[in-house]
Design a protein with these regions (language model features):
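His/Glu-rich zincin catalytic helix
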Residues: 1-91, 124
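Acidic/histidine-enriched segments that form metal/cofactor-coordinating
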Residues: 2-10, 89-187
Length: 187
């Protein structure tokens, strides 16, 4: 329930950053791998879980074919040259871990959530997924059909359609940020 006071929306909300708020602003350590790739590490001791993000400039704006970035990210977990998608899922499950991949506008992110004590066991698997993903054709075709059906269902929902077209109206349909998928893109 509100207090009955109507805020003045012409003014920004007042919020001061206090000294104790500054403690919540974590600053990453910057390291470099032997190949020169930067690593940004935020330590939060006391947590039993880690989150590892592998981030590459490989998002939607770089794709040459509609939905290529989206399906590439989705397929990362579906197998490698040496490990099937079922084996990957079983190994992650065994260690109480979760792996997600997403294609954003400017980047593709592979994220691992895992108990800290098993991180060392899972890093070789993550490296294998990133380096030798196999993109099985049968799994891709099944996923494309499923995603097309989901698209057709969502395309009848006003809120979803509005979100889809907002960027197109803002940037224009020719801009990478303004592109909107159509059903034929799933074929």
């Amino acid at each position: 329930m509100t207090s009955g006071i109507i805020p003045d929306r012409s003014l920004p909300p007042v919020h001061e950053i206090r000294a104790d708020d500054a403690a919540l602003m974590l600053r990453p350590e910057t390291l470099a791998l032997s190949n020169g790739l930067p690593v940004y590490l935020i330590r939060q001791e006391g947590l039993g879980v880690i989150k590892l993000d592998i981030v590459l400039p490989a998002g939607v704006r770089y794709q040459q074919v509609p939905l290529a970035a989206y399906f590439t990210a989705r397929m990362l977990r579906e197998g490698t040259q040496d490990t099937s998608g079922d084996q990957i899922a079983a190994r992650l499950d065994y260690f109480g871990s979760y792996l997600e991949a997403s294609a954003e506008r400017d980047r593709t992110v592979l994220s691992l959530y895992a108990p800290r004590r098993f991180a060392g066991e899972l890093l070789p698997l993550i490296a294998e997924i990133w380096a030798t993903a196999s993109f099985p054709e049968d799994v891709l075709e099944t996923d494309k059909k499923h995603q097309k059906q989901e698209y057709l269902v969502n395309d009848r929902r006003v809120g979803w359609v509005a979100r889809q077209h907002f960027a197109s109206l803002l940037y224009g349909p020719a801009h990478p940020y303004g592109s909107v998928a159509v059903p034929e893109d799933f074929d």
